[in-house]
Amino acid sequence: MDKEKEQTLEWNEAQKIDISVDLLAAAKKHLLFLGAVDRNRCLYDGPALQRAIYRYNAYWLPLLAQYTESSSICQGPLVPPLDCEWVWHCHRLNPVRYKTDCEQFYGRVLDNSGVVSSVNGNCKSQTETLWKRLYPTEPYDLDFANAISEPADVSALEKCTTYDLVLAVKRQSPFFYQVSRAHVDNDVFLQEAVARYKAFLYLIKGNRERSIKLFCVPTYDIDLIWHTHQLHAISYCNDLTKMIGKVLEHDDTDSDRSKGKKLDTGFSGTTAQWEETFGRRYWKAGAMNRGNTPKPVTTSPYVCSGKKSIAKEEESQNVIQYPEVKVIEVILEIVGVKNLPDAHKGKVFVLFSKTQPDSLFNAERRLTVLSESCGEKQVALFQCEPTGELSFQLMSSKSKSLGFTSLSFSEFLSPVTKLSVEKWLELTPTKRGKADDPNPISLRVAVSFTPPTRSPTVLHLVQARPSLKGSCFLPMLRKVRLAKSFTRVVDETETEVINLQMRNSNDAAPKGDRRQVIGVKECGETYVLAEYDGTFWSLLDSKWSLKQTCNPATDGPLFELSGTRMVKVYSGRKLEYEPKHCSKLRSEQDFMTAVEFSKQHPYGKAVGLLDLKFGSIEANEKWLVLPGMVSSFILSDLLKKEGFSAAAKDTVKANGITEESTEIDVLSQEKLEEETMMDVDTTTPVAVAAEKINGGARCFSKELSGNMIEEEGGHCGGCGGCGGCGGGGGCGGGGRCGGMTKIEGCGGGSCTGGSTGCGNCGGGCGNMMKNNANGNAPSVENDAVTA
């Protein structure tokens, strides 16, 4: 039988695996729960976690045992307190140990049947009533702020697991960061994740039957579904016992991602076996490891002080117009070529580009063909707009074009029906030969993408001049001072958005300081966008205010932009903008990060980045575009005298921002250790570096995570990633030349990684990793097997 048909049959057989849970619906609830816990990070470590573990053992499990024995004790579903549910969540992610503990203390596995999550249910009042009746001295909801004063002697309990739940929680705490991007909740993405999870289990089943010892490592989409399945304890036990004869272990204790270690070889082996068995690529856009959880900007959650109106996104459109751009993440691999003339075998490569170049991807890149490169796996990872087509041109080593073909994005993304495809594309010969060639050259192309999402809006502040064409953006902060000069604001296409000017107010007192930011559109319309009254800046008809903060912390916020939302401005690149790899070449003093604090994001969400040196503002949210642009203009103007040093507060104050003594409202609780969000990462994934490189494309660098499990005859591990190149600098050491420069360096913007995809970035700008990725699936011996 043809190999491709065999691989299709294998995939179809894998999809027949019976799972007794609606994993797609359950995964959506799972994501909501992880988000709720992340808004209460005191549950990741410290006194609140210790108290939660005590309450879980002393109160929740006994209550659950009574309920599973007789649901009549509670009218309606049982709803666990958030803290108890979190510990329960982490306990169940060691399914073998959870099963053993439940059977030891309660004689049976305690399931979630009839239980509704604390974040999904609106019917917890009945559970609260039952809780108060059974535990009159213990509140249903844990007081996180005062948890430190409450006893938590777990060892004194009669029924208590010896499993180290503190470490279990710490290992799982970083997982949410890996699955928190918007596309993960997309139905098509989750449907494909469920299908890939079944294929993952199918590999394990086959390995057991053939006595192959392979430490299987899932990507993050698979791991999300795997976790979701384990949370349904009885279903997981029954489904896996039926499939492989035992409960599949999930061991997340191994976090060493070094070259040649178990995680590294495991991901390599899983990739090779997957692609050999199913004829599909294992690496998938949006499912790879994002890197270590960024360092938090605060360990104390922000508490909203009253309701605030939500900014209308249309407000900015009344003043400025800018293009709305969608973006997708793409992973591309050229798998094979057939009907290639013998004279060209082993000597070909592919040039790929977009038929409609855009602000994110506008260059031609080179990729090797896997089947023609002695097993060296080269994969391109990039972002682009979901428009036009990907164009491929097969080239010989003598730079001779052998033909071209293309793949349209609209085939899959308008609407989103499929997020990955692997197919043969017939080439159109560059030079017409025989009219009807019975065996045309064809390329096997594998591409995956994330669902389209809104791309950040990037505006550049440049000195006014006749034309920008053919020259680099001039930095806004140049030493030249021109009376009454305007600063042009242009978008990524170099289209003028508005002109800005700082000027003294006409009604200012002779010795007073009453300045204004004036905006002038091309049509001549004039707007007063901001006014300084001597104490702070008032923006956009007093809808926003900009002031300096008083924060003694070395890394605390420098400025506060408040209005319809609370935004704090920090020096350097923070959170999602945290520099990765080659992007570290830029000085952190060149940047400021805008971080929004809200009920949904009490620890802050990066919503914008100001590049002081090259005069640009990147806004991740539409509501930030206008106030962010005006604030950037003000801050750039005030800080330019200090050589971008944000520490010179006295000079800043003298230039128009008064220091405020008010502090953020915070919960009264012991500060969490920063290491909670940094070093305890045992799902350890790594790094989507969002730095733009020459040509506007984005280069992603990935490393392997380490959330591992072992299983006899089919060892399994945690989330994998892929190796890649780092981001690079553009014009003038990191800027972009007119928004349309050609690609140079950084491996041409394409990333390579071995089948392991493990832990090693491509060593710096321009370097590429090469690995043998697509050999026959190896039989990897493991030195330890857990029960």
Curated annotation (Swiss-Prot):
It holds the Pfam family GRDP-like. Expressed in leaves, inflorescences, buds, flowers and immature siliques. Keywords: Auxin signaling pathway, Stress response. It comes from the Eukaryota. Coiled coil: none annotated. Disruption phenotype: Delayed growth and development. Late flowering and increased sensitivity to salt stress. Induction: up-regulated upon auxin treatment. InterPro entries: GRDP-like. GO terms for biological process: auxin-activated signaling pathway; cellular response to osmotic stress; regulation of auxin mediated signaling pathway; regulation of photoperiodism, flowering. The keyword Transport does not apply. Involved in development and stress responses, probably through an auxin-dependent mechanism. This is Glycine-rich domain-containing protein 2. It comes from Arabidopsis thaliana. The lineage of its organism: Eukaryota, Viridiplantae, Streptophyta, Embryophyta, Tracheophyta. The gene is GRDP2.
